[in-house]
């Protein structure tokens, strides 16, 4: 009996991910999700209190992948910014890209939820990360607007890879190319 319950919960989550990705939080209807999951609408409420709780479950873990990447990299005591990323952050960012649909849902489809504005929060957190790195590695001082621009561009680059995702190899190649451009620029400061 427990296997059946887990299977239904997973069907609901899979259906919700598809519907939230195709539409967004505000446009998605529980009836559409139930139809996609091939269950009655009332059954969704057995597993999830409401649509927002269901949305939370769909995007669970995405923010953590991002912050974990930054924290892993910040914990390293040596290496250039690009070396630190390769040692500490790349596996987490890879995980984000493997969950590209959830990343797009969180960033582009979350208006009306507590997750709205997630991109701005990521940009702010990455800006702090870049400022910490610049304090360690930069050869001069720079207007903080530069760090905001760099962080915004990097987050938007990740999102573009997620939005145009073809397959894992393609995503990792795009990430590698983007990082090469990014780190050559940052390491020249």
Feature map (PLM): residue ranges:
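Short, basic, alpha-helical segments at the C-terminal edge of helix-turn-helix-like DNA-binding modules
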Residues: 5, 30, 60-66
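Helix-turn-helix
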Residues: 11, 15, 19-53, 57
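Solvent-exposed, amphipathic alpha-helical segments
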Residues: 15-22, 65-76, 102, 153, ...
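Alpha-helical DNA-contacting segments of helix-turn-helix folds
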Residues: 56-62, 106, 115-118
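Hydrophobic alpha-helical connector segments
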Residues: 57, 71-98
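Amphipathic alpha-helical packing segments from all-alpha helical-bundle domains
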Residues: 67, 87, 94, 113-138, ...
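Amphipathic alpha-helical segments used for helix-helix packing
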Residues: 93-113, 160
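Hydrophobic/aromatic-rich alpha-helical bundle segments in the mid-to-C-terminal region
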Residues: 104-108, 134-182, 189
């Amino acid at each position: 009996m427990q296997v059946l319950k887990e299977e239904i919960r997973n069907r609901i989550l899979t259906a919700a991910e598809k519907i939230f990705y195709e539409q967004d939080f505000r446009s998605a209807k529980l009836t559409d999700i139930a139809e996609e999951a091939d269950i009655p609408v009332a059954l969704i409420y057995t597993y999830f209190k409401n649509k927002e709780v269901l949305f939370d479950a769909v995007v669970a873990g995405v923010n953590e992948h991002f912050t974990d990447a930054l924290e892993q990299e910040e914990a390293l005591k040596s290496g250039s910014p690009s070396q630190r990323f390769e040692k500490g952050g790349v596996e987490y960012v890879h995980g984000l890209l493997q969950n590209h649909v959830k990343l797009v849902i969180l960033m582009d489809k979350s208006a009306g939820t507590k997750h709205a504005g997630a991109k701005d929060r990521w940009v702010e957190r990455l800006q702090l990360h870049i400022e910490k790195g610049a304090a360690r590695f930069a050869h001069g001082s720079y207007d903080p607007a530069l760090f905001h621009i760099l962080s915004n561009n990097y987050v938007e680059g990740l999102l573009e890879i997620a939005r145009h995702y073809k397959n894992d190899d393609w995503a990792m190649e795009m990430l590698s190319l983007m990082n090469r451009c990014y780190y050559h620029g940052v390491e020249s400061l």
